UniProtKB/Swiss-Prot annotation:
It comes from Rhodomonas salina (Cryptomonas salina). InterPro entries: Ribosomal_Su5_D2-typ_SF, Ribosomal_uS5, Ribosomal_uS5_bac-type, Ribosomal_uS5_C, Ribosomal_uS5_N, Ribosomal_uS5_N_CS, Ribsml_uS5_D2-typ_fold_subgr. It is found in: Plastid, Chloroplast. GO terms for biological process: translation. This is Small ribosomal subunit protein uS5c. Part of the 30S ribosomal subunit. Contacts protein S4. The gene is rps5. One of its GO terms (cellular component) is chloroplast. Transmembrane segments: none annotated. With S4 and S12 plays an important role in translational accuracy. PANTHER family: MITOCHONDRIAL RIBOSOMAL PROTEIN S5. Belongs to the universal ribosomal protein uS5 family.
Length: 168
């Protein structure tokens, strides 16, 4: 009986997550017999409660690539501290390859001002008011990874105070 309840709770937790496909691209591998075609899917998964992840999957069909991307995204979940204004605590920069992302907290009601895969990441993380700028690259995968790198660097005010040895 108790096993059934646990599985129901797990299913409820699973339904909170949303998935958005950023890019599906047909890629080729040159082999002795010619070219082997496969598909690469870039997918972002988040629960709009401060958790988000980027997944990449490759398979011979699109559905298989998306499934692999979902499982990869669940392994790479990042926790995001969100303020009471549904923004981020401070300005932060992230980098992946040539892609750079700058994120700044914004006033309530301004919305998510960002482009491409960075916008998708911020929306699925649950951030409502933010300014973000992509620099250096148009590659959606590197921009998504740069955004998650920036979100990893975020700290709450209490975490910063604790790091500095200040107690209030």
């Amino acid at each position: 009986m108790s096993n059934r309840r646990k599985s129901n709770k797990l299913k409820e937790k699973e339904t909170d997550w949303q998935e958005r496909v950023v890019q599906i691209r047909r890629v080729t591998k040159v082999v002795k017999g010619g070219k082997k075609l496969s598909f690469r899917a870039i997918l972002i998964i988040g629960n709009e409660k401060g958790e988000v992840g980027v997944g990449v999957g490759k398979a011979s069909d699109v559905i298989g690539a998306v499934k692999k991307a979902v499982s990869d995204g669940k392994k790479k979940i990042v926790s995001v501290p969100i303020t009471k204004d549904s923004s981020i605590p401070h300005i932060v920069k992230g980098r992946s390859g040539a892609a750079k992302v700058i994120m700044r907290p914004s006033a309530p009601g301004s919305g998510v001002i960002a482009g491409g895969s960075v916008r998708t990441i911020l929306e699925l993380a649950g951030v409502k008011n933010i300014l973000a700028k992509q620099l250096g690259s148009n590659n959606p995968l590197n921009n998504a990874r740069a955004a998650t790198d920036a979100l990893l660097k975020l700290k709450t005010f209490s975490q910063v105070a604790q790091d500095r040895g200040i107690t209030s």
